[in-house]
Each structure stands twice: as structure tokens, then as C-alpha cells.
Amino acid sequence: MPTSTETPILRGGEWLIQPSEADSVFTPERLTEEHRLIGRTAQDFVVKEVQPKIDQLETKDWALSRELLKSAAGLGLLGVDVPEAYGGLGLDKVTSLVVSEKLAGAASFGATFGAHANLTIVPLMLFGSEAQKQKYLPKLLSGELIGAYGLSETGSGSDALGARTKATRQADGSFLLNGEKMWITNGGFADLFVIFCKVDGDQFTALLVERGWGVKSGKEEHKMGLHGSSTTALIFQDVKVPAENVLSEVGKGHKVAFNVLNFARFKLGAMCGGGAIGAIAESAKYAANRKQFGQPIASFGAIKHKLGEMVVRTYAIESLLYRTAGLVDARIAATPHDANDGSAALAAFEEYAVEASIAKVAGSEALNYVLDENVQIHGGNGYVHDYPAERHVRDARVNRIFEGTNEINRLLIPGMLIRRALKGDLPLIPAAKALQEELLGPPAMPSTGADDGVLADELRAIAAFKNTSLMVFGLAMQTFGTKLTDEQEVLMHLADITMDVFSAESAVLRAQAADAAKSPKASLHADAARVFVNDAALRIDASARQALAATVDGDTLRTMLAALRRLLKVTPINTVAARRRLADATVERGGYPFA
């Protein structure tokens, strides 16, 4: 299913050094009727089949989990990313995003679904041999077999390559697997596992391991949230794995793990966006009906601020997610490939690994804000089990740990950009040098490339954000050189600036597209984009100042701070009025105004 507009192909991270046009990005408003149809299918499945059974799932009824996965299979939801030749739907990544958004309402079952569809089916599709695909995919797609993914260990969470689980080659070519994996979703009842281990001492490798070969599950973990999903240790004691069950190649497990994480981070970001949209609806309805001092609390400015800000942050996340999906689909479409081969999708997600990490971090943190304010709007009712607000908070907390902690992903974002620059895939270094020369020349604002038009001030601000990012990147690379990887605090500030650049530009381009399409909601789109840009300017200024002060001192620091003041001359807007308009539209609709 192609996306409904042609998307020019930017390289990963290229938006950081050049402007983009509104017609170059995919937005939710450009969904086709096919996209919307499968979205409604997923939504109906969640509302009618999963949500009525959430309490039963939280009793650890794994038979029900299996039953629901089979129901999802019957609707084709397990095979969105799988070619038709293997029994899947063979749809685009925009569709995959839409389905992930809708599954956010499935509570714990969303984790069950994700471990099966995203972390078992996807790696098999991308890296499996033809024999492996023929053997396992049909049963995974039907729900006959349930999958799980075993990467983490007690001593190697973020340091995945430090795994101690080992596989010893036998004379017949098979492997004896020994070790233990921790925190495995679906660990209590899955039938097939993607397990990462060391072969011959140091060759990091992925194996497809069947439970029937001797895999044992530990006790169920008592978790903060996601009570309706199974999380256990997996124990391997001389489990014999046939040679043909190596996934990819011996010693290539890192490629499997890291590329699957690119997929998973993007989809986790999508679920976070969908979760935020659902929580906004809960807050809007509660605020409209809850009366204090003789009037609905939705009429109070303090509540309007919360609702408005919930919408602003969700709008930015949704915008960057759909933009990324459009880029991935365009890259796949432009790459000659066999439709039954996952190589094009693999290359596309590798290209946009930075954007996937941004989706994961920004999405999980925006959701955290929205869910926390949802509890606050509910007051005491938000803290009790009778309302879903408290469960949402518990269930969502792990999103900042899943698929690489947010700290790890923050380090990856600038790290990957720098590696791309050093390889010549991203002209970051020449752009930073050119900006430095411009800043050190006679006083004048660096060129922004933005002209007049709708949201022109915001585009000029975003150009300034990009220049700020280049200035800090360039100075940090110049000062620390190869030791920049040791300066994690500076890298974290760079990540925050980078995330705000991508989020802000995605929001503004979407709002411009809405205006160009003469959307009746164009003014609301503009409000959301303007508020986000206004506040991003404050965040970027703070991050840049701290990064600069950690990088240089004395006269050099004073010079760079003066340059920063020249760059970030952003006039504040009336965010109070804009948030009020967004809040009023949210209450009137009874939910997210852009849904």
C-alpha cells in the first residue's frame, strides 16, 4: 500500500543541515482510505475484544493472551510487515504505524503483541533463511506459535554485547545453549524464542530456539505495570539447537539485535503517540463533566493549560512519527528489491536509525507528561483503581526502559550523527565549519533560508535551532575529538537539541501542509506548532548554554554565548491564548482535536 503522496528522500539526519518543504513530509492528514480502514480494524479489535478483558488478563490468564493473539491473526494484524507470499499483508510502514497507534489502547496486551509481532516475526522476516521463514512464519502469523525475544541478561541490560549466555558447537554442527535471559516478555508461555548468545567464546549470535528443546521459564516477575503481560527469566541448560537455526550468521548477532531495535523503537514511539491520544480523550471528558465551584473544571485556566500542553506535545510526536514513516516508505520504494525480501526495509530503518531513536525517546517522554497530567486532572479519582488513569502511568513507565533506555538512546542520537558525518554520509562537519566562519565574521544573522508565508517566523526559528545545533556539535567535536564519547552530559544536551529540531520542524511542516490544504483546522494546527516552537526555543537555549559551558571557558565561552544570543532571537508568542484555543477544541470534540 503506497503512501498517498510522493515523499522526496532525505538521508537520515539530513534535516538537521537543510530546510524541508511542507509537501515533502507525510502527515496523518494524508492517510489513504486503506490506511484508515485497517486503523479502524485495529481500533475495533482493541475496543471490542481486548479492553473488556483487561482485568482478566491481569490475572495472568495466558490462555486468553494466546486467544487474543489468534484473534489478531485472523484480522491480519500480526502480518502487517510480512509479504503476502508468507501469509502477511505486505503493507507499508505508515500502515504499521497506524496499527501500533491503535494498539496503545490494549494495555498489557500491547506488550504481548509487540514481543510476538515486532520482536519475533520481524527479525525472522528480515534475517531468516528461506527454510526458516517457511518453517516458522505461517505458524507465527496464525498465532499457533507465540514468539519472544531474549536479549537482556542480569549483567548486560544496556550492554547487550556483553551477554554471558553461550552456545558451544558440537561435532554434528549443532549448539549446546547454556545461560539465562532476564525480563523476557511472553517468557512464560511463548513457543519460539530469538535468543542472543556467544558462540565459541566471543561470536555474538542469534539463534531460533524452540521451547520443546528444553527451555525453562523462571517465575513471573511482579512488575510495577503491564500486569497482564508475562515477564520471566529464561533458563537454558544444555539446550540443543540445530545448526540450521542460526538466525543470519554466526558472529552477526549484533546486526540482528540493533536493526530489530530500530524497528521496535519506531513502533514503540507510535504506541506512545497513540497512548497520548487516548489519555487526552479521557482527560477532556472528565474535565468537561467534573464540576467544582459550580462549573466544569475544563473552564479553568489551569486545566486549559494542561489540556493544551498535552495536545501540543502529542501533535509534535505524531508529526515526527508520520514524517519518519513517510521517509522509510519512500526509501523502500526507491530501492530495487524483491517484494518478498526484507532487505530494503532493513536498509531503510538502518538509514533512519536516528529518527527511530528520537521517536522512542520523545514519544515515551511526551506520553509520560500526558499520563501524569491525566492523573492530575482526575484528582483523587486518578489515583484509584476505579479509573484507568493510574494503570496508564504504571504501564507506561517501562517505555523509557524498553528498547534501550532513554539515556542510551540519547547517547546514540548524536553518536550516530557524528559517525554518519565521519563516513561522509552526512555533511555535518562542513556545515558546522561554515557556520563557525559566519559567526566569527562581522555581526550579522546567519542566513535562515526562510521567506515570508504561513508560519514563516517559526521556520526562521527552526533555522536558528539548526544553526545552534551545528554550533554546539562543531565546537564539541573540535574540543573533544575522539574523546567526545566520554562526555556523556554534552552528548545528552546535543540529543535534546536534536530532538527538538526534528520535532519542531515536523510540527511546523505539518501545520503548513494543513494550511495549504485549506483544512478547517488549519488555525489549530498553527497554534500547536507555534506553541511547540516557542517552548523549544527556551529548551534549546538552556541545553546549548550548558553544553557550551561544559566544552569551553573564558573568552571562548563568552564569544560562543554571544553567538548563541544572536542565533536564538525568537520573539515569544501568546502561548496562553493558543493553549486555551487548543483546550477548548479538545473539550468540544471530547478528545484529541486532530484525530
Range-by-range predicted roles:
Residues 143-151:
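A short, Trp-centered hydrophobic/proline-enriched beta-strand micro-motif
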Residues 238-256:
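Long, acidic (Asp/Glu-rich), low-complexity accessory segments flanking structured domains
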Residues 136, 162-163, 180-182, 218-222:
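Short beta-alpha junctions and helix-cap segments that line functional grooves
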Residues 1-105, 110, 127-132, 143, ...:
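Alpha-helical interface subdomain recognition
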Residues 156-157, 182-188, 398-403:
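Glycine-rich phosphate/pyrophosphate-binding beta-alpha loops
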Residues 174-219:
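A short core secondary-structure module
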Residues 111-131, 157-160, 168-171:
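N-terminal glycine-rich flavin-associated loop
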